[in-house]
């Protein structure tokens, strides 16, 4: 990312403004006035930094298919009797490496929609593409997701029951460096057979990572945008999943904003490379495993569409290579 001409204009004028202000008032003037000048410079600098956001028309897109996974937690994934691909995973193969083919997924969607793997009711739209774009600079990672949100959730699917009834939610999970098989399975290490909305599970038990350790890197960092209702009340979440899902505490997500018109949604995340507890520290040259989840038609819990596991590279070769 580079500064635009408008950014240079703002920064240069901010500099001359502060110089003039301090010279005019002299060293004998009050500290209060000096601080006012510095604050004004800070405002202009912040404005200039915002103007340096990516020109998305110049950032490459990559379609990632998200799908309704039904009742297929990590325990199912690693059960050879249920999932023949367990052997490949055990050998180091990724789910995407096996199931992504010519831009789509070769999954058995008839089985995924059956009572065996979706005992409640499957949505009519079992999969759809999400166009992902990514860019970064010295301070931030920028991600944009574009997709057409379906409105045909299965009858009986868990839905929002408290205002605002979020029509759409879009989330990205980043796997910590010590998550087992993180680069292979995406966010599946947070999905277990005993979490809420799974058959017979505790309705209060949230997503978790087995043997989680935030300091040790065995956890997921995640960011989410929630649409609110009728274009109002949108919110954002900066949390993580360790011993349980925590929807607060993150300090890296600067802004999540989105818009849905006639079902066409565009969601943009601005995330600092550094952050607080639960925020993965990112740097140029790094490759981060991730997964995408979209809740459409006011659904909650496991009634979402999710991606397989992919990798994001900050200037490094990966499934998605973020532009600098």
Residue ranges and their predicted role:
Residues 52-92, 106-131:
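Sequence context of c-type cytochrome heme-c attachment sites
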């Amino acid at each position: 990312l580079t500064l635009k001409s408008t950014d240079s204009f703002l920064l240069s004028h901010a500099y001359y403004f502060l110089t003039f202000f301090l010279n005019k008032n002299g060293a004998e003037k009050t500290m209060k006035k000096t601080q006012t000048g510095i604050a004004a410079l800070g405002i202009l600098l912040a404005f200039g930094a915002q103007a340096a956001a990516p020109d998305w028309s110049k950032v490459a897109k990559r379609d990632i298919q998200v799908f309704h996974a039904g009742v297929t937690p990590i325990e199912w994934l690693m059960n050879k009797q249920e999932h023949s691909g367990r052997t490949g995973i055990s050998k180091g193969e990724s789910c995407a490496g096996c199931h992504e083919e010519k831009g789509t997924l070769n999954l058995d969607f008839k089985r995924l929609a059956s009572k065996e793997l979706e005992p409640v009711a499957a949505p009519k739209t079992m999969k759809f593409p999400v166009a992902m774009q990514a860019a970064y600079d010295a301070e931030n990672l920028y991600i944009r997701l574009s997709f057409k949100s379906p409105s045909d959730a299965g009858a009986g699917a868990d839905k929002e029951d408290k205002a605002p009834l979020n029509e759409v939610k879009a989330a990205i999970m980043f796997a910590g460096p010590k998550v087992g098989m993180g680069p292979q399975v995406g966010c599946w290490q947070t999905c277990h057979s005993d979490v809420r909305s799974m058959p017979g599970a505790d309705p209060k038990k949230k997503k978790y990572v087995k043997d989680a350790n935030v300091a040790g890197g065995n956890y997921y960092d995640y960011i989410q945008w929630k649409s609110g209702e009728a274009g109002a009340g949108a919110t954002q979440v900066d949390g993580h999943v360790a011993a349980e899902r925590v929807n607060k505490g993150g300090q890296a997500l600067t802004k999540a904003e989105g818009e849905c018109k006639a079902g066409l949604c565009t969601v943009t995340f601005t995330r600092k490379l550094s952050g607080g507890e639960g925020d993965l520290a990112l740097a140029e040259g790094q490759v981060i495993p991730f997964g995408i989840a979209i809740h459409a038609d006011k659904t909650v819990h496991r009634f979402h569409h999710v991606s397989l596991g992919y990798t994001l590279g900050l200037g490094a070769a990966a499934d998605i290579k973020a532009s600098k």
